[in-house]
């Protein structure tokens, strides 16, 4: 019996991503590269503890002109948690979606909310079909969040600028957590832990993601 990936070495563990037994070398080299690893895979979760994302060059981070202050995040804590959960759910419900697709969806959403701020609305749907699906789902859920807020309070509390700021924060978190693998979902793992109900998770430190 040989590894289901390389067909050469002896398999040492079961891989839920390929639904077969694989060797430890292929597990390490093909993880989130050619294999779409389930987020609950024990070997993937263990590898997360040793991930070392490349340092972020602040000059390469998009939307630097949008200031995301700790005060804004504190005042919109409920909105941020909602958006984080909405992005995670939309991506996890989209078969084949990885962090890079979420990055495109977030950029499209940010462009759309930028246009709302300018007074000239433009729906910036990504051309990438996976990213477009995530974009549409988050856009729909955000509209529902604001509708329910108006019904419950009688006023429109959440501004377009608030949504924009929270989206930019999530975009910076994606840049911080993305491990660069083609099928990587380290950012989605973080979102699921922070905003998906994991009892052991702690939210990301805002100060580390706020650009000077």
Identify the role of each PLM range.
Residues 36, 40-212:
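Long, charged interaction segments in nuclear RNA/chromatin-associated proteins
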